[in-house]
Design a protein with these regions (language model features):
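Bacterial Sec-dependent N-terminal signal peptides
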Residues: 1-21
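N-terminal, polar/Ser/Thr-rich
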Residues: 17-75, 205, 212-215
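Short, solvent-exposed loop/turn and secondary-structure capping segments
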Residues: 93-94, 106-109, 156-157, 188-197
Length: 226
């Protein structure tokens, strides 16, 4: 059995400095007014786009131990996440990304749950809209989701998103520590596509692993998108 172990500590600033969405833009109309495109200045962002006097970013620290089983082509991880609420808001839940669920036939986002179809669709979209007959074995398997003391946390998974309900309100300036144990089978990147996976080299008898978005990670919480 060939197993590789690695430890990772990450700091990620969850930015509130994103550009506001502009659904009303004509995208290419040379006479379009700029009033709806430029973000409205506020205490968080000035008209120039520079941080304002009340600018904030939420923060997430990750302490990750990961094991790569090359024979089974499986990645197993245990991570401790420290989430800092620097926003002025009270938070009673948080969201995480489970990107690897897009590789699953039962957890991915490709097929609609609605009984209706859009007015315009393709043969490929019709094929992917069929519910799969069985699980193809891919996607994130959550082994444990607990707080820092080991108490189970209530969570809900919606395709590639996971919502964790906090045991108590997370106020401004406070932090919440939780742990997640997980694993997933690594897909063939050449066959299935995507940013991460393995590429097999039969002549060498080994695989090349190019892993991206490989661990459960915090979603951005911002002042204008929530």
């Amino acid at each position: 059995l060939k197993v590789t172990a690695l430890s990772v500590f990450l700091y990620i600033g969850v930015s509130a400095q994103n550009i506001q969405n502009n659904p009303g833009s004509n995208h290419g109309n040379r006479f379009e007014q700029l009033g709806t495109i430029l973000p409205t200045p506020n205490v968080y962002r000035t008209a120039s786009g520079a941080p304002g006097q009340a600018y904030w970013q939420n923060r997430a620290d990750y302490d990750i131990t990961a094991y790569l089983d090359e024979e089974k082509r499986n990645l197993k991880g245990s991570e401790t996440v420290t989430y800092h609420n620097n926003s002025p808001d009270y938070l009673d839940y948080i969201w995480l990304q489970l990107d690897e669920n897009q590789q699953s036939t039962i957890k991915k986002t490709d097929y609609p749950f609605s009984s209706t179809l859009p007015k315009s669709t393709t043969n490929q979209q019709l094929k992917t809209s069929d519910l799969p007959a069985k699980d193809n074995g891919y996607g994130v398997n959550l082994e444990k989701v607990t707080d820092a003391s080991g108490n189970p946390l209530k969570y809900t998974i919606n395709k590639t998103m996971m919502r964790i309900d906090l045991p108590k309100i997370l106020k401004k300036g406070e932090k919440f520590i939780f742990k997640i144990d997980w694993n997933y089978n690594i897909p063939n990147r050449i066959e299935k596509g995507g940013r991460g996976g393995y590429e097999n080299f039969p002549e060498d008898g080994n695989d090349l692993y190019t892993m991206a978005q490989w661990f459960p990670r915090m979603c951005v919480y911002s002042d204008f998108q929530g």
